[in-house]
Amino acid sequence: MTDLYAVVGNPIAHSKSPLIHRLFAEQTDQDLVYEALLIDTEDTTFQFAISDLIARGYRGINITVPFKLDAFELADELSPRAEVAHAVNTFSFKDGKIFGDNTDGIGLVTDIEENANRPFKDQKVLILGAGGAVQGILQPLLEKQPGLVHIANRTAKRAEVLGKRFETFSPITSSDWEGIPDQAYDIIINGTSASLEGKLPPINSNVVGQDSLVYDMMYGAEPTIFMQWAQQHQPSCQVRDGLGMLVGQAAEAFYIWRGVRPQTQSVIDEVRRLIQA
């Protein structure tokens, strides 16, 4: 019997997750169907929508904007990484219980360490933004033992609060945009959504070194404005968008559900080709 899975969110029509999971299923010879489903909160609640999917026999669900906090609150049991992130992007349904997990961080770490070939260990890391996206990546990143992590945000207080929450994993410094220490970083991660609006975080270009990896968690058909900005200032730096993170978090969810870990680079290449077509 074919197993049912889906991604839920609002909006959802743009989601690449059904394509990604179809490619994973083909690669690993798994019998499943994966759909993108809109949850319209004018017609229903998140809790009712999930109950309906369970009743219809779905085995697991991915959760995207704006329901990751609702998912965190609805889960009967949480993985340690979801508990720390205070957000859930993956549900598994088993024995009448909802298990919540967060695969965003492992998606980013895998993409940077394996696909970009840049281990975090002992590296100087600058993270831009202190919202939900950054919250979800911090624990897996810090477990890789970077040498230094600085979180910068429009409001320094939010960055400071986030840093304190995760300081048991690794020492973290924080500031507003103006307070970023004036030095080059090995890895720079843009966890803001500024690129979606064609905007840049107001930071000094000195943070980009000749050998920096500059990573934007957003992605599109063209290099993001943040990637373009980095290469204008340091043509030799390495730039990468968040498509690999998207595929990486999907691969981790696929592994949770199916017990099989798919290879990601070929899927990244295929999705990129279709986005650019």
UniProtKB/Swiss-Prot annotation:
UniProt KW Amino-acid biosynthesis keyword: yes
GO cellular component term, pick one: cytosol
Gene3D superfamilies: Leucine Dehydrogenase, chain A, domain 1, NAD(P)-binding Rossmann-like Domain
Residues binding NADP(+), per UniProt: G129, A130, G131, G132, A133, N153, R154, T155, A156, K157, R158, M217, G242
Gene Ontology terms: biological process: amino acid biosynthetic process; aromatic amino acid family biosynthetic process; chorismate biosynthetic process; shikimate metabolic process
Catalytic reaction(s) noted: shikimate + NADP(+) = 3-dehydroshikimate + NADPH + H(+)
Pathway this chain belongs to: Metabolic intermediate biosynthesis; chorismate biosynthesis; chorismate from D-erythrose 4-phosphate and phosphoenolpyruvate: step 4/7
Keywords annotated in UniProt: Amino-acid biosynthesis, Aromatic amino acid biosynthesis, NADP, Oxidoreductase
Enzyme Commission number(s): 1.1.1.25
Active site (UniProt): K68
Pfam families documented for this protein: SDH_C (PF18317), Shikimate_DH (PF01488), Shikimate_dh_N (PF08501)
Binding site for shikimate: S15, K16, S17, T64, N89, D104, Y219
Residue pairs linked by disulfide bridges in the UniProt entry: none
Alphabetized InterPro entries for the sequence: Aminoacid_DH-like_N_sf (IPR046346), NAD(P)-bd_dom_sf (IPR036291), SDH_C (IPR041121), Shikimate_DH (IPR011342), Shikimate_DH-bd_N (IPR013708), Shikimate_DH_fam (IPR022893), Shikm_DH/Glu-tRNA_Rdtase (IPR006151)
SUPFAM superfamilies in UniProt: Aminoacid dehydrogenase-like, N-terminal domain, NAD(P)-binding Rossmann-fold domains
Gene Ontology MF, one: NADP binding
Family under the similarity heading: Belongs to the shikimate dehydrogenase family.
Record's subunit section: Homodimer.
Role, per record: Involved in the biosynthesis of the chorismate, which leads to the biosynthesis of aromatic amino acids. Catalyzes the reversible NADPH linked reduction of 3-dehydroshikimate (DHSA) to yield shikimate (SA).
NCBIfam families given in the database record: aroE, PRK00258.1-2
Protein name: Shikimate dehydrogenase (NADP(+))
Natural source organism: Hydrogenovibrio crunogenus (strain DSM 25203 / XCL-2)
Lineage: Bacteria, Pseudomonadati, Pseudomonadota, Gammaproteobacteria, Thiotrichales
